[in-house]
Amino acid sequence: MELVLKDAQSALEVSETTFGRDFNEALVHQVVVAYAANARQGTRAQKTRAEVTGSGKKPWRQKGTGRARAGTVKGPIWRGGGVSFAAKTQDHSQKVNKKMYRGALKSILSELVRQDRLVVVESFGVEAPKTKELKAKLKDMKLEDVLIVTPEIDENLFLAARNLYKVDVRDVAGIDPVSLIAFEKVLVTADAVKQIEEMLG
């Protein structure tokens, strides 16, 4: 199959297994959920009545004081006491096989091609790290909400895009399922397409 280059009167020959496969919604959903879960920190901790610092001594005798009976100062109803159902650190990570992950990326890339959301160009960059220059270039291409994928991070391009809310720059190694579906369009260079094919086999 061929992908038409937007900035040249030519087309790029690509593998149908990477850019022309059927969309597997269940697989993409599973991988995206796992990716988001793996990004969770999960670090939270509260202490139960067994873990708070304090004496184990009964605060006052059972009868005769006129006060409500109490057996510990570490109970949940006491100020400084433990929490009834204390939250603990959790590991939210989900395992995703390499084959599944690559399959999800192929599914997403193929769907981007079908929906005409994948824009392939011969090359892309800016001469200076100027946001204004990049904005004008994207406007000429009628792109606003876009992920730019290059073989390696170009510093000028990265700095120019840093202040644009709906623009992100990634190298091929930095793409992931969430970033690919988060933007309206994905702008990718011809060299990056070849690298993606090599990476996904």
From Swiss-Prot:
Entry keyword set = Ribonucleoprotein, Ribosomal protein, RNA-binding, rRNA-binding
Q: Which protein are we looking at?
A: Large ribosomal subunit protein uL4
Entry GO terms, CC:
ribonucleoprotein complex; ribosome
Keyword RNA-binding attributed: yes
Where is the organism placed in the taxonomic lineage, from the top? Bacteria, Pseudomonadati, Pseudomonadota, Gammaproteobacteria, Alteromonadales
Q: Which domain of life is it from?
A: Bacteria
> What InterPro entries does its record include?
Ribosomal_uL4 (IPR002136), Ribosomal_uL4-like (IPR013005), Ribosomal_uL4_dom_sf (IPR023574)
Instruction: State the organism named in the record.
Output: Shewanella loihica (strain ATCC BAA-1088 / PV-4)
Q: Which family does it belong to?
A: Belongs to the universal ribosomal protein uL4 family.
Matching entries from PANTHER family are given as:
50S RIBOSOMAL PROTEIN L4, LARGE RIBOSOMAL SUBUNIT PROTEIN UL4M
Key word Manganese present: no
Segments spanning the bilayer are none
